């Protein structure tokens, strides 16, 4: 479907990706950050990167914890890389520091701790706690217009700046 669209599709990873395949692509630089170019019109925006697109700055940080990982097979339907590495956390923070913690938009798969809690989602594992805590520190320190995420499979808004997308499509400008 995406191949036939007259646009370039940009995406961040979630928690059900085949990370072995995704990470088999060469890491390249694109609009200021690291990417995997899947095809000419399909680009994976890697974790902890800042991209300038049409004059707007985007911080990206994919990944999330799979609550159903016990029913999945490692390396087939579940990959430990769903949780960010120490290097990804550190690189993301360093990239935000370079921008004085000022971006236009933040795109993540899961939400910061306080936002997830406001939506009624508790924490299920130490890995999930660490990721949501990291995103909470990013939220507390960074100036941004909107933060978009989607892990919870619902359309919702928290405090007018945190937006969970599932069925809804928004245009950023």
Regions found by a protein language model. Give the residues of each.
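Cap/insert and terminal regions of metallo-dependent hydrolase folds
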Residues: 1-4, 104-152
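Core catalytic region of metal-dependent phosphoesterases/phosphodiesterases
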Residues: 1-52, 131-132, 140-141, 166-167
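Short His-Asn-centered micro-motif
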Residues: 12-15, 47, 61, 108-109, ...
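Active-site environment of divalent metal-dependent phosphoester hydrolases
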Residues: 15-21, 51, 66-69, 112-116, ...
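Short, glycine/charged-enriched secondary-structure capping and boundary segments
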Residues: 24-28, 73-75, 120-123, 161-164
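Active-site-proximal loop/helix segment associated with metal-binding centers of metalloenzymes
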Residues: 33, 40, 53-129
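Binuclear metal-dependent phosphoesterase catalytic core
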Residues: 52-54, 126, 136-141, 152-173
């Amino acid at each position: 479907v995406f191949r036939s669209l007259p646009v370039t599709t940009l995406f961040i990873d979630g928690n059900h990706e085949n990370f072995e395949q995704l990470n088999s692509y060469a890491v390249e630089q694109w609009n200021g950050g690291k990417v995997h170019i899947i095809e000419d019109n399909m680009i994976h925006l890697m974790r902890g990167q800042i991209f300038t697109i049409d004059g707007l700055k985007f911080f990206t940080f994919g990944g999330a914890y799979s609550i159903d990982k016990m029913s999945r097979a490692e390396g087939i339907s579940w990959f430990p890389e769903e949780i960010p590495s120490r290097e990804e956390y550190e690189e993301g923070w360093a990239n935000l520091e370079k921008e004085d913690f000022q971006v236009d938009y933040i795109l993540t798969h899961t939400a910061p701790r306080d936002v997830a809690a406001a939506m009624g989602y508790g924490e299920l594992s130490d890995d999930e706690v660490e990721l949501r805590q990291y995103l909470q520190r990013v939220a507390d320190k960074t100036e941004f217009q909107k933060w978009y995420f989607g892990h919870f499979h619902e359309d919702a808004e928290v405090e007018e700046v945190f937006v969970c997308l599932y069925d809804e499509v928004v245009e950023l400008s």
